[in-house]
């Protein structure tokens, strides 16, 4: 029986650290285009209390989305020990392409995945580059697509990358700009033969897309400051609606996914959620535990034992948060968190669309 196994992971975090002082001189506006009367100190304090974000990472000038994706991809390939010429697909999850340094417009042609293949110097003409534009849920959806290609014997090794340079598409006059950051993550997924009774790798997944009334909860638009004309591509987010949607939909979807896999929450050793907002992630996990009547585990210290967090130091890098967090744990850089052979983890994300997805992955007891 063919199973989809993660054979390598990698990530890239920019070295430019942006702390709260960076935003102290910003002029913040509300959704009506009026300057907010509160002091920046008040605005930043409230923001940090909700999100827990203390700092975030921005790319250095001249570094493109495809550049950092290629760095993470190379690390994942090296970790996998698989020859780059044996990669059958490159699935690149992102939302804004490469941002032109002068016009600040998104560049999608050629595709990010094709640029990654070029930067990795992969000569194999049968290696197909494929872009996944799916909001912050793109990397998990890319893993789902890769799993289907592997299980159907259309591929043997697939590189799934996720990358974003959100610092280049945020409105400096929008308070929400403080949420976003830059980064990249990657994984190599390979087809491996196992016995029928061995259940490893991707053992279950689910995706839900609410693309009608919720379509514009997260979108693009002009600056909140009517006089700011630097870029027409700015992330626009209805935080309250997204929060309400997440708490209504995500816990139930994850519970149903576990049920369909004949698993209980106590079978899961780690839960890796998209690092969107600390308050929201805690609330999602609490709701999920409440569905199992695990009310004794709702304290924050208990939540953090099963759900590692990086948003405090790295911010929200969209598609890159889940694979980055996974790689950090696997490389022993998130103590006391660890993933041991045989462990089962739950990964989940939500993003523009609105889309939500989840995946259950079990690590093999030993390497093939």
List the predicted regions and their residue ranges.
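Condensing-enzyme catalytic core mediating Claisen C-C bond formation in acyl metabolism
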Residues: 1-62, 173-248, 252, 350, ...
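Claisen-condensing/thiolase-fold acyl-transfer catalytic domains that form or cleave C-C bonds
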Residues: 66-70, 97-106, 110, 131-151, ...
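Buried hydrophobic positions in well-ordered alpha/beta secondary-structure cores of metabolic enzymes
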Residues: 6-8, 47, 76, 90, ...
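Acidic-glycine-rich active-site phosphate/pyrophosphate-binding loop
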Residues: 40-46, 107-123, 160-165, 224, ...
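Conserved beta-ketoacyl condensing-enzyme motif
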Residues: 6, 62-133, 263-283
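Flexible, glycine-rich active-site loops centered on histidine and acidic residues
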Residues: 154-184
């Amino acid at each position: 029986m063919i199973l989809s196994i993660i054979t390598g992971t990698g990530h890239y975090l920019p070295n430019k650290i942006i702390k709260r002082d960076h935003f102290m001189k910003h002029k913040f506006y509300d959704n009506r285009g009026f300057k907010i009367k509160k002091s920046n100190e008040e605005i930043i304090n409230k923001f940090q209390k909700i999100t827990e974000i203390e700092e975030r990472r921005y790319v250095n000038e001249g570094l493109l989305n495809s550049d950092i994706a290629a760095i993470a991809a190379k690390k994942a390939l090296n970790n996998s020990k698989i020859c780059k010429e044996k990669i059958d697909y490159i699935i690149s999850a992102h939302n804004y392409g490469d941002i032109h340094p002068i016009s600040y417009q998104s560049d999608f042609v050629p595709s990010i995945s094709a640029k990654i293949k070029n930067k990795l110097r992969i000569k194999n003409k049968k290696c197909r580059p494929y872009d996944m534009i799916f909001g912050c849920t793109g990397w998990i959806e890319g893993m789902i697509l890769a799993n289907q290609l592997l299980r159907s014997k259309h591929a043997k090794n697939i590189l799934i990358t996720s990358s974003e340079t959100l610092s280049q598409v945020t409105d400096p006059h929008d308070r929400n700009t403080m949420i976003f950051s830059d980064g990249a993550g990657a994984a190599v997924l390979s087809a491996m033969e196992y016995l029928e009774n061995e259940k490893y790798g991707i053992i279950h997944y689910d995706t839900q897309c609410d693309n009608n009334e919720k379509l514009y909860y997260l979108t693009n638009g002009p600056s909140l400051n009517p006089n700011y004309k630097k870029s027409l591509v700015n992330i626009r987010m209805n935080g309250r609606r997204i929060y309400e949607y997440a708490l209504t939909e995500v816990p139930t979807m994850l519970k149903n996914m576990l049920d369909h896999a004949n698993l209980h929450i106590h079978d899961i050793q780690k839960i890796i959620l998209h690092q969107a907002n600390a308050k929201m992630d805690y609330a999602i996990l609490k709701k999920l535990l409440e569905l199992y009547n695990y009310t004794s585990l709702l304290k924050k210290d208990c939540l953090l034992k099963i759900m590692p967090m990086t948003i405090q130091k790295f911010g929200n890098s969209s598609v890159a948060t889940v694979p980055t967090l996974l790689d950090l744990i696997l490389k022993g850089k998130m103590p006391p968190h660890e993933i041991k052979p045989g462990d089962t983890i739950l990964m989940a994300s939500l993003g523009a669309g609105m889309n939500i997805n989840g995946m259950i992955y079990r690590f093999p007891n030993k390497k093939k």
